[in-house]
Amino acid sequence: MNKIASGGIIRLENGFAAFPEDDPLTVNIKAVKPLKTFFDVAMHGSPTAVGYGTLETNMSPRLLASVIRHMDGWNGQNIRLLSCSTGKQIREEYCFAEELANALGVTVKAPSDTLYISKHGVIYIGELRDGKFIDYHPNQRGRRK
């Protein structure tokens, strides 16, 4: 796990990113301002999984929780997921962010739709900028960890 948590990542002011090497987001993510009391975690995502270092989703919420626990700089803070659609709930299913909140026992703030980051670090959600960040709290719906 320590090898995953230390290899192929970009250190952020308060968090980390894991995008493919040639992805423009490797530059843009560095301009995003940190959010007080939140640890930023950035990579490609979907409502059910994230892509650690790749465009394809390859990591479950529980595996990412384990990576975060081993990451330098994470001291139990809340998480801001800068990963597309990780806060999007499909019907009554649990979304990625909700499962991550359950696994870590902290609040996870995640986008409801596609996340865009400008070269100046400006974030907007949804093609029409009509998305939002949603806060998921641990065991919010009474599910066991």
What are these regions (language model features)?
Residues 79-145:
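Active-site-proximal C-terminal subdomain of hydrolase catalytic domains
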Residues 1-78, 125-145:
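Glycine-rich short-loop/terminal segments
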